[in-house]
């Protein structure tokens, strides 16, 4: 009987030790009013909501050539941060992205911008539904929105990039500190704000509120002539770089003004 107990304990420890997928963290969105979508983050609410650092995937140290691991395997060479706010109408996403070569070759909205230069991506998914949203925002000020009925529709041509943007009331603004599409100099950063309409999210069936859990992933493509690779980063940290890995998305926790944020 004692030996069986030991075997059971060892089996549990083995299974726990083999798991490479930790529980995704939550992202707190604090309630704030009078947010102006200008890409600057100068309202008080932005300084009062938690800041999250974009990271490389856990697998990068193994996947990269040894010559690249030290610079690109542990932390992004070009760091980025993201914060969340909300009010009665919108979920606000704000980001500050260090960037030594700001490039954005896309020429319109509703374009697959991750193949056209630097892009900031937002993925939103209800916990208890298959559908989800993908949003692209570029330093040049373009935006693309994709609605997926399911991850099983991911590569269907009519789903990949619809001509008409599904979120008609979305607001966004990018601000750059540097020069756009000029590779001969060194840029500093670009920042952005996006306001995602809650009623249009809810129109697909599930409200965006505290009674209905939603999940989120932030992704970034960073191209640079000064770096040796195109650098991808995200929050939460992914096991491997797959921005459609819903199981690794973080959970959103909406916090009213007087609520305390758990450390």
Predicted ranges, named:
Residues 1-5:
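Positively charged n-region of N-terminal signal peptides that target proteins for export
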Residues 18-263:
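Structural preference for beta-rich elements and adjacent junctions enriched in aromatics
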């Amino acid at each position: 009987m004692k030996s069986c107990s030991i075997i059971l304990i060892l089996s549990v420890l083995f299974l726990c030790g083999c798991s490479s997928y930790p529980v995704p963290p939550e992202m707190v969105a604090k309630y704030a009013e009078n947010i102006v979508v200008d890409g600057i983050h100068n309202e008080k609410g932005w300084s009062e909501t938690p800041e999250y650092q974009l990271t490389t995937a856990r697998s990068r140290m193994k996947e990269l050539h040894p010559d690249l691991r030290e610079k690109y395997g542990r932390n992004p060479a070009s760091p980025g941060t993201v914060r969340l706010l909300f009010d009665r109408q919108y979920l606000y996403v704000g980001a500050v992205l260090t960037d030594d070569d700001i490039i954005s070759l896309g020429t319109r909205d509703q374009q697959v911008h991750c193949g056209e230069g630097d892009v900031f991506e937002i993925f939103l998914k209800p916990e208890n539904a298959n559908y989800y949203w993908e949003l692209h925002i570029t330093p040049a000020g373009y935006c693309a929105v994709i609605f997926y009925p399911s991850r099983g529709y991911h590569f269907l041509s009519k789903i990949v990039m619809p001509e008409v943007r599904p979120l008609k009331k979305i607001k966004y603004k990018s601000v750059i500190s540097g020069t756009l599409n000029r590779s001969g100099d060194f840029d500093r950063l670009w920042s952005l704000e996006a306001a995602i309409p809650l009623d249009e999210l809810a129109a697909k069936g599930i409200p965006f509120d505290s009674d209905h859990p939603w999940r989120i992933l932030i992704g970034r493509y960073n191209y640079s002539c000064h770096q040796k690779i195109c650098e991808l980063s995200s929050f939460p940290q992914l096991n491997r770089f797959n921005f459609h890995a819903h199981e690794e998305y973080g959970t959103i926790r909406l916090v009213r003004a007087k609520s305390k944020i758990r450390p």
